[in-house]
């Protein structure tokens, strides 16, 4: 398996001129920053079904019976729904263990949410839909991190997506190297604090499931369920409250090493973060400093401190 996470991506977001108007929607963050740390598998579903660029615009039509169809806006009876469905059904199972997918917002083929729906007379309806290709993607791999370009401008959603793709890549790598009970338990142990920061109830629910590993004869079957549970927890953006609980938990590991001044400083930094006066990077940096000075075997394994490459600097923007 590649040492880099592999992401599927709508081709237009990489700068490829494949849009219906012959243009593109190149994403600066993805191509100028994230691209250093991941590999891409490009796809333009509309070109993949044989359409040229430029081409007439497509739209999603909701029929009287409630079915969603993909048709040309200028020729509403020219239907390409089945071509798109067939392409997705043939393409998705063959592209390997992706760590995530970035799709083009509002596209009738790739949009993840709020895609315009029209009635059969060409009038815009009240409801909104999902692009046909992305709908198939979400159905095929419900645990896969999927985001669209517009949402990735939000610092919290961006950080959450990147965190998830690196977690899934690590899990995929674990499986590729051969599953063992020890490896699965070690993986979960390294992600405990990270899971706690995302969803306390999910953290408490997944613990007993992992503890039941000895009852599973089929490790691959266990992996499939664990993957679904892990990614569901990480999909919930970590809250300031949950981060504070984790930071205070970590603080307790240094109670015997720090003097009164150091303990007070650390407590104040965590409280300032909790109250929105400092970004999460402030208490994390101080805790990492103390961890380097007073190594703890358990804390040193925790992925919470470095869930993705520091050079992406995503925590600078997360308050």
Predicted regions and their residues:
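Short beta-strand segments
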Residues: 10-11, 44, 102-106
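Short, surface-exposed acidic-centric catalytic microdomains
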Residues: 45-67
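Divalent-metal-activated hydrolytic enzyme cores
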Residues: 67-87, 97, 123-190
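Extreme N-terminal starter segment of soluble prokaryotic enzymes
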Residues: 2-7
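N-terminal glycine-rich phosphate/adenylate-binding segment common to multiple enzyme folds
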Residues: 87-119
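Short N-terminal binding/cap micro-motifs at the start of the first secondary-structure element
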Residues: 14-22
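Short catalytic helix/loop segments, enriched in acidic residues and glycine
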Residues: 23-41
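Acidic, Ser/Pro/Thr-rich low-complexity regulatory regions
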Residues: 146-319
């Amino acid at each position: 398996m590649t040492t880099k996470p592999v992401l599927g991506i709508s081709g237009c977001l990489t700068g490829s001129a494949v849009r219906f108007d012959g243009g593109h929607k190149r994403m600066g963050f993805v191509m100028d920053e994230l691209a250093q740390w991941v590999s891409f598998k490009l796809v333009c579903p509309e070109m993949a079904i044989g359409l040229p660029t430029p081409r007439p615009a497509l739209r999603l039509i909701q029929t009287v019976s409630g079915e969603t169809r993909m048709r040309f806006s200028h020729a509403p009876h020219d239907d390409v729904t089945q071509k798109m469905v067939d392409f997705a059904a043939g393409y998705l199972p063959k592209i390997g263990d992706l760590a995530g997918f970035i799709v083009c917002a509002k596209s009738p083929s790739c949009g993840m949410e709020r895609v315009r729906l029209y009635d059969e007379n060409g009038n815009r309806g009240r409801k909104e839909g999902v692009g046909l290709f992305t709908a198939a993607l979400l159905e095929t791999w419900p645990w896969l991190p999927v985001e669209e370009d517009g949402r990735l401008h939000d610092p919290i959603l961006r950080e959450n997506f990147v965190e998830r793709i690196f977690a899934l890549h690590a899990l995929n790598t674990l499986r590729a190297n051969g599953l063992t009970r020890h490896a699965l338990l070690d993986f979960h142990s390294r992600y405990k604090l990270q899971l706690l920061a995302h969803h306390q109830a999910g953290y408490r629910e997944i613990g007993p499931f992992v503890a039941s590993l000895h009852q599973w004869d089929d490790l691959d079957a266990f992996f499939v369920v664990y993957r679904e549970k892990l990614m569901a927890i990480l999909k919930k953006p970590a809250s300031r409250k949950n981060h504070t609980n984790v930071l205070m938990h970590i603080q307790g590991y240094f109670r015997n090493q720090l003097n009164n001044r150091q303990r007070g400083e650390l407590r104040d930094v965590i409280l300032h973060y909790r109250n929105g006066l400092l970004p999460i990077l402030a208490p994390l940096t101080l805790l990492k400093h103390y961890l380097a000075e007073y190594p703890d075997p358990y804390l040193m394994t925790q992925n919470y401190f470095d869930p993705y490459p520091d050079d992406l600097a995503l925590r600078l923007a997360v308050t």
